[in-house]
């Protein structure tokens, strides 16, 4: 049987083991991120990809929808923002959520996402209703696979930032200098 994800994963592993890397015009020293940050981002991207592979292998034992492969770069968006910057995510942005939860510390992104894939009642964001990306602790409202239903929510959240400043709310949930992120596609 032709299994493209496994073929790609094995080819990648062989090239890394052989130190067979493509030539690059950039290097870690020329980047604005420290090398350990780049490794951490790569780790989040690999975690996201391996969650997809795990879910494919668990077919029939877990709930599974479209994977996050191809959206691994969103981990960089998470690294470039704060855990208090609200993020309304595309349903395939698992790498963002993994990186955001790692930044917050004390959270278990892979365990939580496995619970979500299995529609477990112990899933901390959906309680077993569906594969959902989200985390209350890191200001990522839950988002299922409904296409673009989170866009109006993101606009409302962004509007609320200005309102909170104009009203000089001392107990606003988000910091006064927060930004609202929204990914879609």
Protein language model features and the residues they cover:
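Charged, compositionally biased N-terminal leader segments and the immediate start
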Residues: 1-32
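Membrane-targeting and insertion segments and their boundary/processing signals
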Residues: 12, 25, 29, 48, ...
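Positively charged, low-complexity intrinsically disordered leader regions
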Residues: 30-45
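N-terminal glycine-rich anion-binding loops that anchor highly charged ligand groups
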Residues: 43-54
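Cofactor-binding active-site loop characterized by glycine-rich and histidine/acidic residues
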Residues: 53-185
